[in-house]
Design a protein with these regions (language model features):
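Short, extreme N-terminal segment that most often corresponds to the first beta-strand
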Residues: 1-20
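Low-complexity intrinsically disordered segments
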Residues: 5, 27-28
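General helical structural elements
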Residues: 6, 10, 23, 76-81
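Residue-level detector of alpha-helical secondary structure
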Residues: 15, 19-23, 59-62, 66
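Acidic, low-complexity, intrinsically disordered interaction modules
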Residues: 28-90
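Short acidic DE-rich linear segments
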Residues: 92-95
């Protein structure tokens, strides 16, 4: 996979980390859907998901990216609907 990071509002250190993660791990391509109430429309953004357990190998990355790790709220491990936390990297970071 050839990855070139675009210039975005993300700081350069975070972009370098994203680039390394996408090279080293097998990100899952996905689409994130969100509803814009003021436009009454649903939008879809391409994104990549990386399981957080992969980040456990590199603890400083997990700490650096903590704000980007998505947790499904309202459910606990073992309950219906529980999902392991994952790192979300929006496709617009990548060219």
């Amino acid at each position: 996979m050839k990855i070139k990071i675009k210039s975005t509002s993300c700081n350069s250190e975070a972009l370098n980390i994203y680039k390394e993660l996408l090279k080293k791990y097998n990100p899952v391509e996905t689409t994130i859907e969100y509803y814009a109430e003021n436009y009454n429309e649903t939008y879809q953004n391409p994104a990549y998901l990386i399981d957080v357990p992969s980040l456990a190998i590199i603890p400083e990355l997990a700490e650096e990216l903590e704000e980007d790790i998505i947790y499904r709220r309202g459910s606990k491990r073992g309950e219906e609907g529980y999902q392991e936390p994952f790192l979300l990297i929006y496709d617009d970071y990548i060219e």
